[in-house]
A protein has these predicted regions:
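Extended catalytic cores of very large enzyme megasubunits
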Residues: 1-265
Length: 265
């Protein structure tokens, strides 16, 4: 345990091997940094309480805080959610944000469910969309290019709704089948479901898949009372492109990939 603390968390010269602090210095510096802006009359009381709690292992703190909060990086967030819109400006600026936060030791959540599906129209059909996989490969490369100052490799979980047009391709991205062209194995994935889809699974009904840009506000209404009504409205609208799949078929595919890879949430 002590060796792990020294190797992963203590401030040091990772090229030359010099270690500049002990574990107790690490704990007190974390406490001093976190409460540095508190009023003087209460600050040291909080510092002492926090130092006692972490140094006696009564509470645990995440790697980004333990490794970086007392350094010039000042990374206070252990995890960061990057919310991506369906535009190139948003996608590319989000990729830059992912890189910066990975370099600052944060774990990354990528909310990519607004990105439209493959072959969707862009500018009225002037261009066809390449789909989510090429952008996921870009995010994967960004996450893996930083090692979080030698403490650990970057990591990210990408979130998609189960009704996304490309969901069947998304849930297999981590498995060992396929080729490098159609797999993005270094990212993890989270699939968003609700009671509506679970009930359709129980009743052996269909799930309708959409490209997010064809169904305005559907993604943003997830988790609200309006979602179910809006989803059914779009299902009934014959002018909206859509495909259907058996709920049991899709969810069992998801569970199969989860069992085999262990990294679909």
């Amino acid at each position: 345990g002590l060796r792990q603390v020294v190797d992963k968390y203590l401030v040091q010269d990772r090229s030359g091997g010099g270690v500049y602090e002990s574990p107790q210095f690490m704990y007190i510096m974390i406490a001093l940094t976190i409460f540095a802006e508190y009023p003087k009359e209460v600050r040291m009381n909080y510092v002492k309480k926090y130092y006692d709690a972490v140094s006696k292992h009564k509470i645990n703190i995440p790697t980004p805080i333990m490794g970086g909060v007392r350094t010039p990086i000042r990374q206070f967030a252990s995890c960061v959610l990057v919310d991506i819109d369906d535009t190139l400006d948003s996608i590319f600026s989000s990729d830059m944000a992912i890189g910066r936060y990975v370099a600052q030791r944060a774990g990354i959540g990528i909310n990519a469910g607004r990105i439209r599906g493959i072959n969707s129209k862009i500018r009225g059909g002037e261009v066809q969309h390449t789909g989510v996989v090429p952008f996921l490969k870009k995010f994967e490369a960004t996450v893996r290019c930083c090692t979080q100052n030698g403490i650990r490799g970057g990591s990210a979980t990408v979130h998609f709704p189960i009704w996304h047009q490309e969901i069947r391709d998304i849930i297999v991205l981590k498995n060992n089948k396929g080729t490098e062209d159609n797999r993005v194995r270094k990212l993890d994935y989270s699939i968003q479901l609700s009671a509506l889809f679970y009930q359709r699974f129980i009743d052996n009904e269909k799930i309708t898949l959409f490209s997010p840009h064809d169904v305005p506000n559907l993604f943003d209404s997830f988790g609200s009372p309006e979602f179910d009504e809006l989803y059914r409205t779009y299902e009934a609208d014959e002018s909206i492109p859509k495909t259907t799949i058996g709920a049991q078929e899709l969810i069992l595919e998801l569970l199969k990939e989860r069992a085999e890879t262990g990294r679909i949430y």
